[in-house]
Amino acid sequence: MRAKISSQAAVAIFLALVTCCLGTVIKGLGVSGVFEDTLVVFEKVETEDVGARLVFLGDQRPKNPYGGTVRVLFQPGESGTCSIPLLQVRYSNCTNTSAAVFSGCYRTDTEFSVPRANRGTSPGFVSLRTPTMLDSGDIYVTVHLDHLPRPDAFRIKFVSLYTGNETVRISTKDRAGRDRDSYGGASSPVGGRDSNRRTASRNDDGDLPLALYGPCRPCGKNCKNLREYLLTEESWHEWTSVFAPTTVAPTTTVATTAMRSTTVSFATMTAEVITSTGTVSMEPHNTTTADMVNLTAADPPPSEPVPALNALAIGLVVGGTVASLVFLSVILGGLISCCARRRSARRLLTRSNSAREMEDLAPSSEDARTSRMSPDVVELSELVNGAPLSHRNDIGGDDLTSISSASG
């Protein structure tokens, strides 16, 4: 007896195989994510793609053209009280209904990003430039399809062991005079100028950690279960204003080192850059959310592969149609000429058969022709001519006159 495998068992086996080969597989409402639970970088890298591979499993694949948005959030490893927006990419009019999500889209727009977080090589990934230890934390990838009521979210733990070369000490103060760490968490009141200072690593390009490029949005009671919170429609609408396009933050040069101004809402920040030449202090200054960085204008124009593919497809269809017509015309011409030749050969064969039949029917000698004449005519011809009649044409006008006078 042959055992039958149900569809659910087949899907479970497939997911088990994919999990063993590629990592964790989570099936969401609209899309599924394939990713590694923990991604570790042991040394310096130019860029590192972090995220989840987005796929359609089972009945998730849409039957009509669709669109959607991908958002990437960063929760610093040293602070579990807030999260920072890194990237937002919008995909429109995706007509290719393959297993890969957002493939064959007519338009792809990077609506929001920070200087060190760009769009990855595939949807669902963010490309981090030269990540350091302070870029370690949790990366959340949220995906919202336009035709679905709520988004899907996936969590990837990212760890970088690269320390960087330069060091930055940063402390912040809120209006109450309390120190706030660079990730937005409040600590005890300030005891002195150097108290409760944090040490951050700068990479070779002089860039600050990801946590210092945008305001860390407090998540309150939702921080412990941030992924479950990001699965709600409420969270998607709350983050919409945070991911709105903003202006590019100005840069300040200190001791020949370019340092981007950080963004901490309603806070006063004091920074010291420790270099080989000594310590340079910066005066406290107020920053607003206008310092958030949006690289939409700096991004290269989004690629639109589908129109190009459509033009190529149209060219192939037209060329194939013309070639088919030429091929059919050649075949039809050959058939017509073949039929004409066969018809001509049939006519010639019919004529030759008719001529052969006539020859067979024609008498072979004079005696045979004479034997076919009427006996009376033969007798009269013999009486007049005195000799046997050889042909009908032998009877002339004089013979007829003689016959008539003799009979008279």
From Swiss-Prot:
Signal peptide span: 1-23
Residues bearing attached sugar chains per UniProt: 93, 96, 165, 286, 294
Origin superkingdom: Viruses
Virion surface side: 24-311
UniProt xrefs under Pfam families: Herpes_gI
Coiled coil: none
Assembly mode: Interacts with gE.
Protein name as annotated: Envelope glycoprotein I
Species in which this protein is naturally found: Psittacid herpesvirus 1 (isolate Amazon parrot/-/97-0001/1997)
Taxonomy of the source species: Viruses, Duplodnaviria, Heunggongvirae, Peploviricota, Herviviricetes
Record gene name: gI
